[in-house]
């Protein structure tokens, strides 16, 4: 195989072309590729961080929802407890009022019974005196009648 001048010229031209590409063309291409790799790596890292943050946020939201449910249940339980307390207080007050009304009724009945009893004593005493007057046949003086009535009322 003969090396002639054309082949040597082509080798020199190719070497200059390779040197030119390595010096001026290759670095910007490599730089663009590396920058694109960094950009993709950053995007993947950001996506992974966002996914992790979304997962963490989801857990926090679920915890907050559970806490809100627990708090709501506590409020409902407290309201039910307070309602029951109020109902119990109302029952106690109603029972006390009922007892008071019954006592007042008994007192009124007792008072009325005593009044009627006193009226009855006076009428019985008056009838006894009237009967005694008829038996004796004469009228005893008024002061003596009142004394006798008072004594009879006290005895009855």
Curated annotation (Swiss-Prot):
Annotated TM spans: 7-27
Membrane topology: Single-pass membrane protein
CDD domains hit by this protein: ATP-synt_Fo_b
UniProt KW keywords: ATP synthesis, Cell inner membrane, Cell membrane, CF(0), Hydrogen ion transport, Ion transport, Membrane, Transmembrane, Transmembrane helix, Transport
Location(s), subcellular: Cell inner membrane
GO cellular component annotations of the record: plasma membrane; proton-transporting ATP synthase complex
Pfam families: ATP-synt_B
Gene Ontology MF terms in the entry: proton-transporting ATP synthase activity, rotational mechanism; proton-transporting ATPase activity, rotational mechanism
Keyword tRNA processing among record annotations: no
Location, primary (coarse class): membrane
Purpose: F(1)F(0) ATP synthase produces ATP from ADP in the presence of a proton or sodium gradient. F-type ATPases consist of two structural domains, F(1) containing the extramembraneous catalytic core and F(0) containing the membrane proton channel, linked together by a central stalk and a peripheral stalk. During catalysis, ATP synthesis in the catalytic domain of F(1) is coupled via a rotary mechanism of the central stalk subunits to proton translocation.
Quaternary state and interactors: F-type ATPases have 2 components, F(1) - the catalytic core - and F(0) - the membrane proton channel. F(1) has five subunits: alpha(3), beta(3), gamma(1), delta(1), epsilon(1). F(0) has three main subunits: a(1), b(2) and c(10-14). The alpha and beta chains form an alternating ring which encloses part of the gamma chain. F(1) is attached to F(0) by a central stalk formed by the gamma and epsilon chains, while a peripheral stalk is formed by the delta and b chains.
HAMAP family: ATP_synth_b_bprime (MF_01398)
Family to which the UniProt record says this protein belongs: Belongs to the ATPase B chain family.
Protein name: ATP synthase subunit b
The organism of origin for this protein: Histophilus somni (strain 2336)
């Amino acid at each position: 195989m003969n090396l002639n001048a054309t082949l040597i010229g082509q080798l020199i031209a190719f070497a200059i072309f390779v040197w030119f590409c390595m010096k001026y063309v290759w670095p910007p291409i490599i730089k663009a590729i590396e920058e694109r790799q960094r950009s993709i790596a950053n995007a993947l890292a950001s996506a992974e961080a966002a996914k992790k943050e979304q997962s963490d946020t989801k857990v926090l939201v679920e915890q907050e929802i559970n806490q809100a449910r627990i708090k709501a249940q506590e409020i409902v339980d407290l309201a039910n407890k307070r309602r029951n307390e109020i109902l119990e207080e109302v029952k106690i007050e109603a029972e006390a009022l009922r007892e008071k009304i019954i006592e007042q009724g008994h007192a009124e009945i007792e008072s009325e019974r005593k009044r009627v009893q006193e009226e009855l004593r006076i009428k019985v005493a008056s009838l006894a005196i009237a009967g005694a007057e008829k038996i004796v046949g004469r009228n005893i003086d008024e002061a003596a009648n009142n004394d006798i009535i008072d004594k009879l009322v006290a005895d009855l």
